[in-house]
Regions:
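Hydrophobic alpha-helical segments and their helix-loop boundaries in membrane
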Residues: 2-260
């Protein structure tokens, strides 16, 4: 009995010692919190794509291009959305890579243990991207308008720094800036197709063929022009080149957008 008691006592002491050693080890975030964080990111992913990336500009420009060509529902919305997503992935790849290296890698390595630090690290590359687009297009008025409505003094913009602009003010200002840039590019896309419409309409009137719908005549010429100039590569390439990057001068971006 004494031997059995000693054995049980030794086992209890060993278990207690093991528990003490385990409690002394640093603990990171629990698996439950990691799963909750992952589900939150997945849920907010569509909103993040819409609000903080170049998706808005690309999708709006492609939609305006479809209207300018007068092709109705061709290409289908699924095609334009898919093309916009793929172009967004190409443009946002450097920014996403920064987020991964500066936030995800330290978080997985245990160097970041609280969500506030993780958020601060992850949002900085996105903030740099959004500020770069606003600066390249010169659409600071949208940012000042949002900040003014939030009660922030913008009477002297020279005193403001990027640190004074939070995400609540930056995101809507960025979206308004992207919409303005998209409409500017859409206007430039409309011009050649508008010329074709005017020429064809004038020819039909001069030939007393006013009963013939101009769309039946202009659409083949629009498609021919678009194919001859390799329109898809030209439009998508210009779209991806219109976003400010570290290796692209602001003057070149402004020329693509039509601000030069």
């Amino acid at each position: 009995m004494a031997a059995a008691g000693d054995a049980l006592g030794g086992a209890y002491a060993g278990a207690a010692g093991a528990g003490t050693k385990d409690s002394d080890r640093p603990r990171g975030l629990s698996p439950v919190l990691n799963i909750m964080l992952l589900l939150t990111v997945i849920t907010l992913a569509p909103s993040i794509v819409l609000m903080g990336t170049c998706f808005i500009r690309i999708l709006v420009v492609l939609g305006l291009l479809r209207q300018a060509m007068g092709t109705g529902s061709l290409p289908p919305p699924q095609v334009t959305v898919s093309l916009s997503l793929m172009a967004t992935m190409v443009v946002m790849a450097p920014t996403v890579d920064r987020v991964y290296k500066e936030a995800v890698v330290p978080f997985r390595a245990g160097e970041i243990t609280d969500y506030r630090t993780l958020w601060d690290k992850a949002k900085q590359p996105m903030r740099d991207f959004m500020f770069a687009q606003i600066e390249a297009t010169g659409n600071w008025s949208s940012l000042y308008m949002v900040m003014s409505h939030r009660g922030i003094d913008v009477s002297d913009p020279s005193r403001l720094t990027r640190a004074d602009v939070d995400m609540v003010s930056l995101v809507p200002a960025f979206m308004l800036s992207e919409l303005r840039a998209a409409f500017m590019m859409g206007f430039r896309l409309y011009l050649p197709f508008l010329v074709i419409d005017m020429v064809i309409a004038t020819m039909l009137i001069s030939m007393s063929m006013m009963m013939l719908p101009p769309v039946l005549v202009t659409l083949p010429f629009k498609l021919l022009l678009f194919v001859l100039v390799d329109g898809w590569a030209l439009v998508v390439g210009s779209l991806m080149g219109s976003f400010a990057r570290p290796d692209v001068a602001t003057a070149a971006v402004n020329f693509v957008l039509g601000y030069a």
